[in-house]
């Protein structure tokens, strides 16, 4: 914190550091479908969400059994980017895999 002297009024004004709120976070949720192979889902989780083999398999099984699972939690722009990347990658390989973004 720094101080400055207001010479006209002989008052010391202390500057407060700027405070910024953390950005709102969003979870990326992978949705189940009847056509995308489980191995492909594991690959997507590893490639786009940085999951190791064990975590990717666990999330894939949750998607398979419960219909959905959270892949990660990110600021809005990064979550939207991950969704676009997954969608483009899946479509290019003829898979209907979908994910959505929800407030965390």
UniProtKB/Swiss-Prot annotation:
GO terms for biological process: protein catabolic process; proteolysis. InterPro entries: ClpS, ClpS_core, Ribosomal_bL12_C/ClpS-like. Involved in the modulation of the specificity of the ClpAP-mediated ATP-dependent protein degradation. Belongs to the ClpS family. NCBIfam families: PRK00033.1-5 (NF000672). Binds to the N-terminal domain of the chaperone ClpA. This is ATP-dependent Clp protease adapter protein ClpS. The lineage of its organism: Bacteria, Pseudomonadati, Pseudomonadota, Betaproteobacteria, Burkholderiales.
